Design a protein with these regions (language model features):
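Long, low-complexity intrinsically disordered regions enriched in acidic and polar residues
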Residues: 1-412
């Protein structure tokens, strides 16, 4: 993908924006203080904390950059102002599947977002505030952040399509990191090297075990790449860009591996989401089929690719496509095998938008579950159909890979 393609929002992501919160019955991104027990408590706490006009607290770390007004965007850092909060857990999606939505809301809405507007090219020569934001983004451990607030606090929480939500926000006139920042040495070296491309830096850091969440954060903060190419990248774009970069890297490896010799089904459920991964004995091909129980009158969303991958953005499933594909490719590469993959993702009525991470982490959890083996595609799909709540026929009516695989079987 190129950044110019990333502002596009998938059709399923537009569906997510209509999701009604089960707590208050309103659209999640239009939360009301009068009804939300989580947010009301958070807002009351921050109102007391802001009596001095400044805030001090630990950041997981977390930085955010919006896309509105691009190429001049709002960006900043987040800190937690509630006592007893595990700052590290606030930005650790790999640990969130075991939490309830109530717990996740309580965690994420306790993050205060201090923001300022920046031209995206200012990443190349940052001023004092942006430099502090970039410094916090580099840290691999929680850091203490101090903000001086100007103007009123925006009471409405921030629910995004791909990024995890945050609590109240306000404009800051000053922001600084208190104490030392802990960053991997090689990351610091690549940040200082303005002759290495972002894709080269991402590839090397991923090979060294740096995860996609850290990579998306430093990429969003404009800390990777050649000097002339560095810019602030809206957080939701950076998440998908990193998922796509890593997926393409892994795909180049997977295409050279041996093909599996059986049909396998993996499954997992958490947080009102269920995933079923069907691996088939074929060269690489991939399809994501996503259905919403809240919108049964609408057809499932679908995107796919064949052996050489995609050359255009996945317009139906959006960022979810790249998140799920990354987890599947990572699994195949780690096992030294190649396969085709058809992934069914079902979203229950209780879900509210908490970010694209759940596609990545739930797929990863499913693939680590052991799975079941079947003798044919029809047997595998029959099992998946018995576990889905939306009729299998609705998913298959949108699938391109299932009829293709069946036609190849008949030819063989």
């Amino acid at each position: 993908l190129v950044l110019a393609e990333l502002p596009a929002v998938g059709r399923t992501e537009r569906t997510a924006e209509r999701v009604v919160c089960p707590v208050c019955g309103n659209v999640a991104r239009f939360c009301k203080l009068s009804k939300c027990p989580y947010y009301r408590g958070v807002y009351e706490a921050i109102s007391r904390s802001l009596s001095s006009g400044s805030l001090f607290g630990p950041s997981p770390p977390a930085v955010l950059f919006g896309e509105w007004g691009y190429p001049k965007v709002y960006g900043g850092a987040c800190l937690s102002f509630l006592e007893g909060v595990n700052a590290w857990l606030l930005e650790s999606p790999s640990r969130w599947l075991t939490l309830s939505i109530d717990d996740l809301l309580s965690l994420r809405l306790a993050l205060f977002f201090g923001r300022l507007r920046f031209p995206v090219v200012s990443a190349r020569r940052p001023g004092k505030v942006l430099e502090a934001i970039q410094e916090s983004a580099l840290s691999s451990l929680p850091v203490d952040v101090e903000m001086k607030i100007v103007g009123s606090v925006k009471a409405r929480p921030g629910f995004g399509v791909r990024a995890s939500p945050h609590g109240p926000s306000a404009r800051v006139e000053d922001l600084r990191v208190v104490g030392n920042v802990s960053a991997p040495r090689r990351v610091e070296q690549l940040v200082s090297d303005v002759d290495v491309s972002a894709s080269e830096a991402v590839a090397e850091l991923h090979a060294r075990g740096v995860d996609e969440y850290y990579l998306a954060r430093v990429f969003s903060a404009g800390l990777l790449g050649r000097r002339a190419d560095r810019r602030l990248v809206p957080t939701e774009w950076s998440i998908t860009a990193i998922d796509d970069m890593l997926g393409r890297m892994l795909l180049r490896r997977v295409r050279d591996l041996r093909v599996i010799d059986e049909y396998r089904v993996f499954e997992a459920s958490a947080l009102f989401n269920s995933v079923f991964v069907v691996l088939v004995p074929s060269v690489w091909m991939f399809e994501l089929l996503e259905g919403w129980l809240r919108f049964l009158d609408e057809s499932p969303y679908a995107d796919y690719e064949f052996y050489w991958g995609r050359s255009s953005y996945a317009e139906s499933t959006g960022g979810a496509y790249y998140a799920v594909r990354l987890s599947v490719l990572r699994y195949l590469a780690s096992r030294g095998v190649q396969a085709g993959a058809i992934v069914f993702f079902e979203v229950d009525r209780g879900w509210i938008p908490l970010g694209v991470w759940r596609f990545r982490e739930l797929t990863r959890a499913a693939l680590e579950s052991g799975g079941r083996r079947f003798d044919s595609l029809d047997e595998a799909l029959s099992y998946v159909g018995s576990r889905l709540r939306i009729p299998l026929s609705k998913y298959l009516s949108r699938s391109r890979l299932v009829p293709f695989i069946r036609s190849q079987s008949r030819l063989a």
